[in-house]
């Protein structure tokens, strides 16, 4: 798994800048994606994928210990759908 420090190191090399600047740009970019998705927007990055916030409706679930059926309330999920360009890339 690659963390933000490894990612910022590689971005800094390719952008010919410092790792600190690269880390700030990456964090700002990710914060803005989350902010826009939370505001109800779909973020479409051509050739990469779509980020969005979706509502999962309420559902029934079973407690495995008591076997009792419970109602699970609806919740908002953060979803990413990969572009076919990267989904099937080798």
Curated annotation (Swiss-Prot):
It comes from Thermoplasma acidophilum (strain ATCC 25905 / DSM 1728 / JCM 9062 / NBRC 15155 / AMRC-C165). One of its GO terms (cellular component) is cytosol. Homotetramer. It comes from the Archaea. This is DNA-binding protein HTa. Histone-like DNA-binding protein which is capable of wrapping DNA to stabilize it, and thus to prevent its denaturation under extreme environmental conditions. Gene3D superfamilies: IHF-like DNA-binding proteins. The keyword DNA-binding applies. GO terms for biological process: chromosome condensation. PANTHER family: DNA-BINDING PROTEIN HU, DNA-BINDING PROTEIN HU-BETA. Keywords: DNA condensation, DNA-binding. GO terms for molecular function: DNA binding; structural constituent of chromatin. The keyword DNA-binding applies. Belongs to the bacterial histone-like protein family.
